[in-house]
Amino acid sequence: MARQRVGLLFGGKSGEHDVSIVSAAAIAKAFAQEDNPDKYELLPFYIDRNGIWHDPEISQQVLTAGKALPVETVDPASRWQFPPAAPSIDAWFPIVHGPNGEDGTLQGLLTLMEKPFVGSKVLGSAAGMDKLAMKMVFAQAGLAQVDYVGVLRSEVWSGPCVFPKVCDKIEAQLDYPMFVKPANLGSSVGISKVRTRDELEKALDLAAEYDRRLIVEAGVTAREVECAVLGNDQPKASVVGEIRFDSDFYDYETKYTDGKSSMHIPAEIPGAIAQQIQELAIKAFQALDCRGIARVDFFYVEATQTVLINEINTLPGFTALSMYPQLWQQSGVPFPQLVDRLVQFALEDVPQA
């Protein structure tokens, strides 16, 4: 049987460009293991910081280096052209994190190309990327979550007459400490923990540099636990894992620096709580109409034995430090089998004519 060509898409214009490269390198390694080389021919496609797609030869150099390489100046018109090898792809494996990668825009392009691809479609990707939209869906689905307030960049940068009133509104609804986040960035980019009015104002200004939609969440004393989901209409949940860290919160540096945080799989929590988290993870996955892959993050409030959903990530990281592949490893699905299953779920999710 002829091997199927899988296009590995990585890089992109977002602040998570470097994380995407590391994830792609790990995925490429998994495709070279077990019987995957007999089933798939992997072709990498690197999208540079200018949004230009590069052919497999240059893309492989980026994968090998594990970081962005200086590339020759390309005609700007080529930004709208696919590399010659692109039309031959049977299925795409996008691992472009952040805006224009996991927010439905790239998924829309792949849909127009009429090719199967790993992960959620436009709806699930868009709702899963925007934390405000996500929380509205969670609320509609009856999923318990922390209190929050949505803010627009225009309110933050409105001047001395309006901005203080915005902060007053936030303080009236939430107690310190709070977390201020851009609504559409992952990997903890642009997030601040605030304890005072002055810190709140500065954090809002910082978050507004990254996004026009912001979210302020109430702080909660809880353990951070995560559950991976795999599948389409009958998704399965992995064992539950826990993230432990010594820093004030799980920021970008803590997340991607060796020794800054540790994973505990399975999490040392009561069996009934673990089962509840698995059920809630699947419920969240289905509420957003996710496909193939997602990681769902929760707060486990030990004092009250309650579980609050934090967020869903429809395109979680695949680096050596990433929770998603490790959760499945501990659930009996090694990395090479995981990428194989994801491609198979993508192939089966093609509408029948």
From Swiss-Prot:
Gene3D superfamilies, per the entry: 3.40.50.20, ATP-grasp fold, A domain, ATP-grasp fold, B domain
CC per GO annotation: cytosol
Alphabetic keyword roster: ATP-binding, Cell shape, Cell wall biogenesis/degradation, Cytoplasm, Ligase, Magnesium, Manganese, Metal-binding, Nucleotide-binding, Peptidoglycan synthesis
Protein localization: Cytoplasm
Known EC number: 6.3.2.4
Binding site for Mg(2+) 1: 297, 311
Substrates-to-products reaction catalysed: 2 D-alanine + ATP = D-alanyl-D-alanine + ADP + phosphate + H(+)
Domain (ATP-grasp) ranges: 135-344
Domain of life: Bacteria
Annotated residues for binding of Mg(2+) 2: 311, 313
Cofactor binding notes: Binds 2 magnesium or manganese ions per subunit.
Cofactor: Mg(2+); Mn(2+)
Family of the protein in this entry: Belongs to the D-alanine--D-alanine ligase family.
NCBIfam families the UniProt entry points to: D_ala_D_alaTIGR, PRK01966.1-4
Role played: Cell wall formation.
Protein's name according to its UniProt entry: D-alanine--D-alanine ligase
Name of the gene encoding the protein in the UniProt record: ddl
